[in-house]
Amino acid sequence: MRQLLPGDTVWRNIRLATMDPQQQALYGLVDNQALIVREGHICDIVPETQLPVSGDNIHDMQGRLVTPGLIDCHTHLVFAGNRAAEWEQRLNGASYQHISAQGGGINATVSATRACAEETLYLLARERMMRLASEGVTLLEIKSGYGLELATEEKLLRVAAKLAAENAIDISPTLLAAHATPAEYRDDPDGYITLVCETMIPQLWQKGLFDAVDLFCESVGFNVAQSERVLQTAKALGIPVKGHVEQLSLLGGAQLVSRYQGLSADHIEYLDEVGVAAMRDGGTVGVLLPGAFYFLRETQRPPVELLRRYQVPVAVASDFNPGTSPFCSLHLAMNMACVQFGLTPEEAWAGVTRHAARALGRQATHGQIRAGYRADFVVWDAEQPVEIVYEPGRNPLYQRVYRGQIS
C-alpha cells in the first residue's frame, strides 16, 4: 500500500488521458489510476489498488475521465466594444482588407479601448477569462495590441497582470504592439515601428509586464522588413517571439519568425512547404485558429498534411477577439479544427494541451499529466476525450483542478 504524506491529495478511480506522447494508447489513456498531488504538483500516478479506498483528502471520481487542463495559447482577451457592424458589412460583400482601409478593423477596437477605463477593461476581460475557465482552461495567453500607443498598451498589460494576480488561471501575457499601424501613424508605419522598437518593447519589458513579443506580418499589417525590426529588438533583449503570419497571403512571415526561433507561427493558412520546413528547423509551433477562418469565410486552409509530414507540433487556440473570432470557447475551436482543417480529435487535444504549452514555452511544466508537472487538470462527466470535441455546445466539466485545488 502506498503511503501518503500529510497534505497529499488524491484523485482515485479515474480514467486518465495523460496526453503523454511516450504512451502508446490513444490520448495516453489508462484506466483505474490515481493521482497523488503534493504542493500544487503531480507527485505520482499509481494504480488505484495501491491506495486506500477512502480517507482525508481522497476524492473518488467513480471512473470519470481526467485530462490535463486546457491551454488557450492565442487570445486577444482585453478590449472594449464590439465589431458587429463590420461583420454585417462583410456579410454584405465587404472584404477584411477594405474595412481596414476605411479605418475599421483593428483600429476601430483601438479607439474604443483607448477610451475605456482600466477597471472597466478588467471587468470585461475577467468575465471572458471565467468563461474559458468554465470549459477547463487552466493556462491562458493574453495579447495586448488594442492600444498601439505606450500608455494604452501598458494599460492592457496591467489588466492581464491583475487577472493573473487572482490565481484563478495562469496568464501568459504577450506584447502585440506591432498589431496594426495606428491612425496617427497612417502615413508613417516605419515611424510607428520605431516607436515600438525603441520605446514600447524596452520600457514595458523593464516593467516585467509581458513574456513574449508578437507581431502581425501581413498585407494589412507589417511587411517582412518592419516585422524583422521587431524581432531583432526583442531577441536582443532576450525576449521570446511569435507571429501572426500567412493568414491572408504568403509573405514569408513563418520563415522569418522561425529564423528567430519563434515560439509559434499563428494562422498559417497560406503557409508553404518552405515555411513548414523552416518551422521544423526553428522549433516553432504552428498554431491553428479555425475561428477566424470560419468567421472571415476564408477558403485557404492551413497545410495540415505538410505539418504532419515535417512533424511540426500543431496547437489549436480560440483567437478570441472582437473582429475576426468572437468565440470565447476552446471547445468550439477544437471542433472547428477537426471539421474545417481535418485534424483528428487526438490532434485537437494535443493542440490544446502539450503543443499549446510548447507554444507558450511551458512544455516542461504544463500540458501533460506526468509526475513533476503542475497539478492542473480537469475531471469530465465523459468516457472518452473525443466527446468534448464532438459536442462543443455541451460542457461535461465535472471538476476543474488548478494548482492542486478544486476551483
UniProtKB/Swiss-Prot annotation:
One Pfam family from the record: Amidohydro_1
Residues noted as binding N-formimidoyl-L-glutamate in the record, renumbered to the chain: Y146, N321, G323
Required co-factors: Zn(2+); Fe(3+)
Positions of Zn(2+) binding: H74, H76, H244, D319
Enzyme Commission no: 3.5.2.7
A biological process term (GO) from this entry: L-histidine catabolic process to glutamate and formamide
Binding site for Fe(3+): H74, H76, H244, D319
Bound cofactor: record note: Binds 1 zinc or iron ion per subunit.
UniProt: 4-imidazolone-5-propanoate binding residues: R83, Y146, H179, Q247, T324
Presence of keyword Hydrolase: yes
Function, in words: Catalyzes the hydrolytic cleavage of the carbon-nitrogen bond in imidazolone-5-propanoate to yield N-formimidoyl-L-glutamate. It is the third step in the universal histidine degradation pathway.
Similarity comment text for this entry: Belongs to the metallo-dependent hydrolases superfamily. HutI family.
Protein name: Imidazolonepropionase
Protein source organism: Salmonella heidelberg (strain SL476)
